[in-house]
Amino acid sequence: MGSQPPLGSPLSREEGEAPPPAPASEGRRRSRRVRLRGSCRHRPSFLGCRELAASAPARPAPASSEIMASAAKEFKMDNFSPKAGTSKLQQTVPADASPDSKCPICLDRFDNVSYLDRCLHKFCFRCVQEWSKNKAECPLCKQPFDSIFHSVRAEDDFKEYVLRPSYNGSFVTPDRRFRYRTTLTRERNASVYSPSGPVNRRTTTPPDSGVLFEGLGISTRPRDVEIPQFMRQIAVRRPTTADERSLRKIQEQDIINFRRTLYRAGARVRNIEDGGRYRDISAEFFRRNPACLHRLVPWLKRELTVLFGAHGSLVNIVQHIIMSNVTRYDLESQAFVSDLRPFLLNRTEHFIHEFISFARSPFNMAAFDQHANYDCPAPSYEEGSHSDSSVITISPDEAETQELDINVATVSQAPWDDETPGPSYSSSEQVHVTMSSLLNTSDSSDEELVTGGATSQIQGVQTNDDLNNDSDDSSDNCVIVGFVKPLAERTPELVELSSDSEDLGSYEKMETVKTQEQEQSYSSGDSDVSRCSSPHSVLGKDEQINKGHCDSSTRIKSKKEEKRSTSLSSPRNLNSSVRGDRVYSPYNHRHRKRGRSRSSDSRSQSRSGHDQKNHRKHHGKKRMKSKRSRSRESSRPRGRRDKKRSRTRDSSWSRRSQTLSLSSESTSRSRSRSSDHGKRRSRSRNRDRYYLRNNYGSRYKWEYTYYSRNKDRDGYESSYRRRTLSRAHYSRQSSSPEFRVQSFSERTNARKKNNHSERKYYYYERHRSRSLSSNRSRTASTGTDRVRNEKPGGKRKYKTRHLEGTNEVAQPSREFASKAKDSHYQKSSSKLDGNYKNESDTFSDSRSSDRETKHKRRKRKTRSLSVEIVYEGKATDTTKHHKKKKKKHKKKHKKHHGDNASRSPVVITIDSDSDKDSEVKEDTECDNSGPQDPLQNEFLAPSLEPFETKDVVTIEAEFGVLDKECDIATLSNNLNNANKTVDNIPPLAASVEQTLDVREESTFVSDLENQPSNIVSLQTEPSRQLPSPRTSLMSVCLGRDCDMS
């Protein structure tokens, strides 16, 4: 064979033969091949072609060789070779572009030299044939070609290898979809034998612009519409084994829509059901095994089409970048992700996750879609989450789900809208862990709420346990998971405060331990009763057992009521809180070092108040226990109670009683005193009834004083007090009618007083707490028979130093205190005498300096707001400002007012301005409720009616009188008169448990002085005065029968 033709020379074709058309349908190419093969013997020799090409590149003539020669002359200077059979110009190929002895592909000598039909570049036939399987483009000029001329033995003797149509196309041509032989699919098999051409074989362009461009506002589809579609498509794309055949029927567009939905919903592949098989996807592996890259191409093409939509050029560019980087970087490397982020934007991580999942799986694309498991939809990238929760939890256990729902509903009812829920329904461990961790991040504003009710969490846990015990005994199916704790009580058992009060957190932990130990010591032998206050803890133990099988609604209601009533109970807490605030305690002393800020005082007060509430719960159970088993109470060594009482009087006790341990110590103290006094009273009358009365009164007194102590937190505390007291009257069920009536009347009177006297009382108490705090302790201890009746059990200690000034109203003079201590109590019954001495000794010893006017002024400056509740039933003032429960309790007040009046004992209270209304009612009830001492009514009446008609301005003016202490002498005289009146009360009054509470108020002084004529009118028209919203000084609180028994 002679010298081979130059590279640029085309093969000449037979004269009269039409030039071969551009690649079109398969039938046309077949006919062209047949014609070419049939006419090979008529072609001119390659030598003639070489000579023509040597002179100049010539256009193949469609007619004859002469035309070809003339055409060669025309393009002699152009050095271009036009494309045969087309109007497009071909790229120039220099004659010496490729050495004759080297193949551009294998860089070795030619083996079976072959020429491409378009550019006539020559290569080894085997090299270019394999090349065409990958890309049907010339390696040199990148022109696509359709056939290869090879085995050229003569000018007219050669063979033509026509490429199979399925291999036509290129990655860089968006109008063609390149397919590998190994990725045979239904669509490809159908298109190979279809005469429709490559247009029908390419991926159907989605109707939109792609998921990536939706976020840019090009086209947006609402996510909530896609979620149902997404779920349906998931079901379609994950058929069972029996339905695998149906997967083949899904059209390509449906698959693209499905994938688009996954990207919109943010649903990622969770796992692949691959049976433990997986592939290596490292860059080194792909470099060593380039054939493994082939399976990635179809998936990449589809996913990029989903993301970019009709932007085919972007699809090709990103696909090229990915395929190039796969062998450079690991798929999980940051470099790989960084190269794709400019293109995929916020979908980069999702795409990489899907890509890695597919690359690692052992399946092809179709099998991967079938075996992939997807997570629930995550929030959309651009739109954010439209649901309230980004976590979807599906519990397989229905019982656990129901219990969770109950707990969630319980928390949602709480007024505390903070993220720190009160886990009153959780177990003890949950309380410790959850609340402690939450408190570590709480700010100082939350500390007031947090530290105060640490033991209330203990009580909540105990209550939960007790409820479980009750539900076991009960035949109903209702299981109470927990109750909504008041806002102030939701704190953990172990309090760990942030930054500024870390020492306080550790201190409270220690105090909490002390509290628990003392509670356990008292609850030995009857742990089921004293461990916590059950829903029936306000009832006697006998009643509690009888009501063990009450319906679930009664159980739930009584539980809530008991929680609040017990939070108001426990006179022992009252005593401890008063002493804890008046005497230096570790916590109080720290607050003084911090500047004696109101917030600090109120915080400590709220803490002690909460703790006392918890122990009041405990004490309520204990009280019921004592009623059930009096022998146990009587058998308890009296010396032990006396010892405890004397120990609690210590200043060391008062220091320990601060914050959490304050309530525990007060528990022992009040319990010992109430037990001691109850034993004395039991000699002459029903001890248990009086015992309940003492607990009841002190519980209310504590509640009221607690409110006044936290005046700085008036908005918060007052609402809480109102809520707790208004609800507490439900659970105040007792065999003692006085117990019921008083609780009811106190609650209702407090609500009436709410509107007008709330602001007045707030302002008044701010001044009165400081000026009267010194005499408060004396008055409490040296009050009237009523004071002594309350105190006998030690319950009537003042809740805080804020209570000290109220007693000063009853006893502003030191002479009155000493007289009461020496002679006044000797005149009264002996059972009151011993208790009074204990109380007067305690207050006289610890507060001798408080009796002076100078000290009163100093207290006025240092004390926070105070309200003296000498009578045990006056928790109403603290709860008086509860607006939410106001209407509800007014209705109940009207409903039960008549019954309560007839059965209630005498309760005489000279109250602060805010208690005026409730005390008016009390006096009214005294007129209607059996034998009473007229002297008491005379003593109470002068201050009642005038106050009910007082205006806001008048009361505020009277505040000024109080602040100036202009009426101290007058107060002393009036109170001495009151004392005389109390001395004249016959033992019958004491046996009926008539209790006189003397409270100091400037308005009360003026009423005592100027309004003596109102006694008759008050007694004759008590019901008319009760509704007055301004009545805020005095009221006789009469309990009511709880209709829940």
UniProtKB/Swiss-Prot annotation:
Q: Where is the composition biased (Basic residues)?
A: 588-597, 613-630, 637-647, 721-730, 854-863, 880-897
What segments bear the compositional bias annotation Basic and acidic residues? 539-565, 755-766, 816-825, 913-923
Post-translational note: Phosphorylation at Ser-98 regulates the E3 ubiquitin-protein ligase activity but not the SUMO1-protein ligase activity. Phosphorylation at Ser-718 increases the E3 ubiquitin-protein ligase activity versus the SUMO1-protein ligase activity resulting in increased p53/TP53 ubiquitination and degradation. Sumoylated.
What Pfam families does the annotation carry? zf-C3HC4
Any idea which UniProt keywords this protein has? DNA damage, Isopeptide bond, Metal-binding, Nucleus, Phosphoprotein, Retinitis pigmentosa, Transferase, Ubl conjugation, Ubl conjugation pathway, Zinc, Zinc-finger
Compositionally biased tracts (Polar residues): 453-463, 566-578, 731-747
State the residue spans of region: Interaction with p53/TP53: 456-731
Mutation: residue 921 to R; reported impact is:
No effect on sumoylation
Where this protein primarily resides, as one coarse class?
nucleus
Q: Where is this cross-link: Glycyl lysine isopeptide (Lys-Gly) (interchain with G-Cter in SUMO)?
A: 560
Q: Where are the zinc fingers (RING-type)?
A: 103-142
The record's region (Required for DNA-binding) falls at: 51-374
Give the span(s) annotated as Disordered.
Answer: 1-35, 442-475, 511-692, 713-936
**Low complexity: which segments have biased composition?**
521-534, 654-669
- InterPro entries named among the record's database cross-references: Znf_C3HC4_RING-type, Znf_RING, Znf_RING/FYVE/PHD, Znf_RING_CS
Region of interest (Interaction with UBE2I), residue spans: 854-917
Location of region: Interaction with TOP1: 456-882
Top enzyme class, one word, equals transferase
Q: What does this protein do?
A: Functions as an E3 ubiquitin-protein ligase and as an E3 SUMO1-protein ligase. Probable tumor suppressor involved in cell growth, cell proliferation and apoptosis that regulates p53/TP53 stability through ubiquitin-dependent degradation. May regulate chromatin modification through sumoylation of several chromatin modification-associated proteins. May be involved in DNA damage-induced cell death through IKBKE sumoylation.
What name goes with this protein?
E3 ubiquitin-protein ligase Topors
Tell me what organism the protein belongs to.
Answer: Homo sapiens (Human)
